[in-house]
Amino acid sequence: MHFLTEHEYAVVTRCADLMLPPHGDFPGGGVAGTAEYVDRTLGAFDFDPPRIWAGGPYSGRFGGDARFSEFLALSRLEELAWRTRIEGSRGIAEREWNGAVRGWQEVYRDGIAALGAGFLDRDGADQEAALAVVPEFADLLFEHACEACYGAPEYGGNRDLAA
């Protein structure tokens, strides 16, 4: 894991299944790799180059050179924008040119904490009710779950090309 704790990883997995449940051949957002996608995204700057832009132009899955697994270096402005988006402004002047920014890392940490330590022990209806109380977290996780399920597996989701 890169950013999430084991507990946070499990919570993200469960929430992804609540948001994108298994149906037909689709295994659900959890099994499809949402937590891995989120963990890699929130920890993108643990890698060099950061895991933001997969290379290309081909994945190699259907011909061509497999270059998606080779991530591209970011420009100075791209790094600033992505660090601000992921980490928040953190009081750093160059990240606050348009005001303070709450980063995704903080949204996830606060949202998971607000769900409570016993979240995983609740039944599905109680879990859905708990998610409704943290809309900023739930909205961001839903966006990331969709990206994880339908995006390129090199970003950590769409396990076994599930979607």
Q: What function would you assign to each model-found segment?
A:
Residues 132-163:
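Long, amphipathic alpha-helical surface segments
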Residues 12, 16-140:
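Flexible, low-complexity segments enriched for small/polar residues
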Residues 4-5, 21, 151, 162:
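Generic, ordered loop/turn and secondary-structure boundary motif
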Residues 1-14:
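C-terminal segment of N-terminal export signals and the immediately downstream linker at the start
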